[in-house]
């Protein structure tokens, strides 16, 4: 079994089953080439309740997905959900260098939005820019190239319980897999099925 460079792997550790899915990226989209499903009850309210059985469920699902796809799985995107997930809005404000908004100013504004009080038992999962304000002009989707001296980023920050995230990460790592990213399952679903207009 070889590792294909144009392959994405997702793992969903659910309340009733653990799923590993392998997709091959093609110009027209993603073709599902492998799936592994293991019945399990490893999560409760988004939190792992037994590390050892979670590891075994992931291992079995990954082995089945490898067998079906003919690919060796070394890393995966891991879905997370549960009642411990919270969201809050934030605002990041920065001065614009050179009076023209560039990609660096966007990134600095998004980073500035993370300077909020987050309890030590929580971890940021996603920082989702909603819109931008340039010198008081609101509702801007992409301010790159615009003239201005002040940039504000209106951002939605998604956090999760640090222990829940760490237990999922630990379980996947114990199977011998690297984690590409931990992704909020609802966000992944919206990316997969909604058009750009529907997301607005």
Predicted segments — roles?
Residues 1-15, 21-200:
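Nucleotide/phosphate-binding catalytic cleft detector across ATP-hydrolyzing
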